Amino acid sequence: MLQLSNVSKLFNPGSADEKIALIGINLTLKPGDFVTVIGSNGAGKSTLMNIISGVMTPDAGEVAISGETIHHLPEYDRSRWIGRVFQDPMAGTAPRMTIEENLAMAYTRGKKRGLSFGTNARRRALFLEQLQRLGIGLEDRLRAKVGLLSGGERQALSLLMATFTQPQILLLDEHTAALDPARAELITRLTEEIVREMKLTTLMVTHNMEQAIRLGNRLIMMDKGRIILDVSEERKKDLTVEQLLGEFENISGSKLSDDRVVLG
């Protein structure tokens, strides 16, 4: 489904600020895989997401979806295959537009330019049906400006918009990190439900180690631009946070020092 082959990315090459962001990344996700990604700041997690989504292009290597090479395509063209939810609830939606208008925009994502963002009765009924699935009352606020929503409501809408046209790949970039615990748990539950029901192939970056172990069928750990650990579903079932920390120390030769990494 998703394949990265020898992907590398270098920032500020040839300067005093040169930094290796990714080096020789090889990663394959099978259809329906839900892979969590853990690692400290600077490990390369966000760069990995940006290269898959088209925000950045790799300096070397290839990115392919369902056998089709896409690393040369801009972000807009990839949106027909890829949905993404960001850490910032303000990203991914248009605050001055209504919920209905945002959903109309998501509905046309990846389709030919010039397609109307307008809404007819059939499309509105579809929007209402999808909003009801969230279970937080947004179906009763279809014409409310998105900028008036709470962070949790907005992130729930972002999740719905990212999955509205059932993308082949769903990228979740620390999408619960900016929320309070109750809202974070709500978005996590909605994520699990949507991914399971739609059988979405998903890559989720998180700083919460307990969450990384609990969610999905596979876990990868990154450090200094490399994938240093790849945990299968069978092994993941019995993995503890303490064991995961120990694995990191054994492989990297250092302790996980990022204060943002949450143990559970």
Predicted regions and their residues:
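Conserved beta-strand-loop-alpha-helix hinge in the C-terminal portion
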Residues: 226-252
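ABC ATPase NBD coupling module
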Residues: 15, 69-83, 91, 113-120, ...
